[in-house]
Amino acid sequence: MGFLKFCRIYPIVFLLIIFTDMKAQVNNKDNLMIGAEIFIEPGQSDYNVEGWFNTLLENNMEITRIRMFENYMKNEHGGWDFRLFDRAFSYAEKYHIKVYANLFPATDFTDVGGFKFPADEEHLNRIADYVKNVVIHFKEFSSLYGWVPINEPGGGNMNDPLAQKLYNTWLKEQNAKIEKDKLTDYHHPSFDHEKFLRYYNTWYLKWLTDEIRKYDSVNPVHVNNHAIFNLASQYDFPAWRTFLSSLGGSAHASWHFGFFTRRKYALAMSANSEILRSGAGNIPWFMTELQGGNNIYSGIEPMCPTKEEIGQWLWITIGAGSKGAIYWCLNPRASGSEAGEWAMVDFQNRPTDRLMEAGRIGTVLKEHQQLFSVAKPLNSKIHVVHVKESMWVENRLARDSSKDEIRLPGAVMKSALSYFEAFSYMGLQPSLEELGEFDFYHSSYQGHTMVLSHQIAIPVKYHDKLRYFVRKGGRLMIDGLTGYYDENAICIMINDFPLKDLFGGSVSEFKYMGNLFSLQIDGENLPTYALKGSIHPQSDSHNQVQKIICSDDHKIYGLINDYGEGNVVWIPSPIGLGARIADNYKPFIEFLQRHIDLSDAIRFEPFLDNVMMKTLKSGDEYITIVINKSDSEKTVKIMAPFALRNPAMLFSNGTAFIKNNLLEIGSEEIAVIHWNTH
């Protein structure tokens, strides 16, 4: 297969290769589809398998995903025997269900999620043979919708022979690009491991996609990442766009939402979805796995979703632009560590209230197919940005045993999430994107706000891009240790801080304050966490205007620095993380409202704790999805910069009522409202 040659040329040509036949099959105007995964394993009766496909149909589900176990495709002589899966695909045809085939090469029975990388070249060749046989055989079924080349990439082992061989090749190429003087340049820790893991995830995913394309150039290729709040720095989504048809994800509350309490799982789903939407860019995205049922021994935080949560999670993904979702799972597997768990049918194969609730939503989507198929998320011009290098540096330096959250892995992401949460309670729809995904090529950023909250490492290559964003009218909001390190974990705030012109000064010092303390900003006390940074203002301001917004004892703790046509709001203390840890967003939100112009945004007035809204635009019509996670009924005033007329309730799971722009909505309720502007 010319493996080593391919390894050498791949890094050079990878970003230049765009396969035109990959993007034509799934587009951003496709109808929305919902479904549930049917788990196929030996021992299932013909009656039950057919019944599951019929159950999907009866509950307005159009799509399923099937895990294509190689272990269940070989007879006692080692020959291929596809009968178990042929039956499933045939019933899918009978009941008009589309199938995403999830490739799952042979692995140990206890390997629940599948291996993430091949062990060696011989293993890679076996995988290639498996892909060839499965794709050639199952592409003949009309029920085949597309391929998932690997289940939940990310977090794999890099100690195997193949990984080491690729790593050595990759490292030589990286070192050839680096010019370094050992006597004058700062020494720093190596982040080659993190960089290579990101590269390797992409390499293997593209290799699998290329193997599929040898035998099927038509059907879509889609993948579901997972644990996005922990593994985001491993995923090179812009590179994936060049060969995938669509992007997906697994968002299981019991596995992946450890940064959140259960009340805030809807918020977690919203943040997860926005990360995927940003990652997908110009290709569609589709939530590949949503938790559908109960945990007993699996998961980290065991739970059984309520029917209300099932509906909330689905509507949130739709509000973030997903072309639908598949629940894991319709039927429970009978064996293994997840036996009897996760299902949307009961042990007698009857629909649970969770399945019926998803089916109700499916009915609404079918009845309003045209409205939803062309609907796009209406972003609030607020960009909450996380930085992969910040996650790398934090993971390297953090103390897992620390009792202080600021010193634990995750503070970087939680800081970004704190702003996302605050904006969500204002009824806004912020984006949540990696710095490398942000579009720095517009001629104007008037009305746009970028948030860099405790993003501790900012690569030097972005310094001028951030200057450009602000100079062209953008507002940059910075808190915590943002910009403390460069991409090599070198502290750039000591001596001559390279961003002092943009930020409005340099940090004089940080003081560790323990747990929560207060900063008085604009005359109001804000909960702040752990670190207090004082500012030495820029003396040579080049006619820049600075406004002090936080000071005491002759020290400055916060300022606004005008720069070009925009400005920077800088508070070098973790005020976002402070609001999150205190679970007191009121003063923080009031601070944000003073410094961000929201007059052109659809929003709540006033803000509402634990209430959120996603907004879609479909032609000249609008759809608002409001979810009340508080413990009481709320009156929600929906404001817009233009007249929203003729509100009509498309879906409610309770007694929600809308009149003009006032919505009455009970605890745990969902209200999906259709508006027009004429």
Task: For each feature predicted by the language model, list its residue ranges.
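Short, acidic/polar
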Residues: 43-57, 127-135, 229-240, 306-314
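N-terminal carbohydrate-binding accessory modules
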Residues: 22-63, 371-374
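A conserved amphipathic helix/loop scaffold
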Residues: 453-678
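Polysaccharide-binding and catalytic clefts of secreted carbohydrate-active enzymes
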Residues: 118, 129, 133, 137-275
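Aromatic-lined substrate-binding rim segments of carbohydrate-active enzymes
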Residues: 49-125, 132, 199-215
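A short, well-structured beta->alpha microelement
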Residues: 420-443
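The substrate-binding groove and active-site-proximal loops of carbohydrate-active enzymes
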Residues: 34-44, 69-82, 112-126, 153-154, ...
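Hydrophobic targeting/anchoring helices
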Residues: 222-225, 230-413, 510-514, 521, ...
